[in-house]
Amino acid sequence: MKNYQMIVDAQKCVGCHACEVACKQEFKAPLGYFRTMTMYLDSGTFPKVKRDFLPLMCRQCDDALCLKACTKGAISKENGIVKIDESKCTGCKDCIKACSIGAIYVNPFTNIAEKCNLCEHRLEEGLQTACEATCVANAITIVTDKKDIPKEAKPFKNHKDDKPGTLHIGANEKMKNKLTFGRSFSPLNYEIENWAVDHE
């Protein structure tokens, strides 16, 4: 049985948002809702300024907080993928409150929780995930063999109890200050002029 794991190289990401668009198109996510979001952080002062990017999606956590929070038994993990059973989900939003990076939303039309599932339907057909296939910078990779994990890849933890399956390379740790429990990926939830800038 394959165990899928995503590697995100933030050092390669150019912030083009192609992964977000590909994901929305693949899953027909409602307007204003995202399974994937590329965050960015500006730092420095003119003329020495820098912008870091960080593609974020469900990190397919081990012992996932959302799984433990779901009282309906709608969330499970198999093959390295944290899955939501649509037939059991009631849209109660307990999983949203539990996720430390806001990777889950409830579809307003179906009242069912949705998030990244590593494009499981594509992987089963031997295809790349929509985001990996679309990334122009080759910043996203899915591996099934531990030997293929770069030594510099590590979990991007936003909470002490997080156990991300997805690993990041070169992620700016200050971006953790921009993430909040229970706030789903959406431009409606983030004021760009505030969360994009490092005020420290």
Residue ranges with predicted function:
Residues 1-200:
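Non-ligating segments of multi-cofactor redox enzymes
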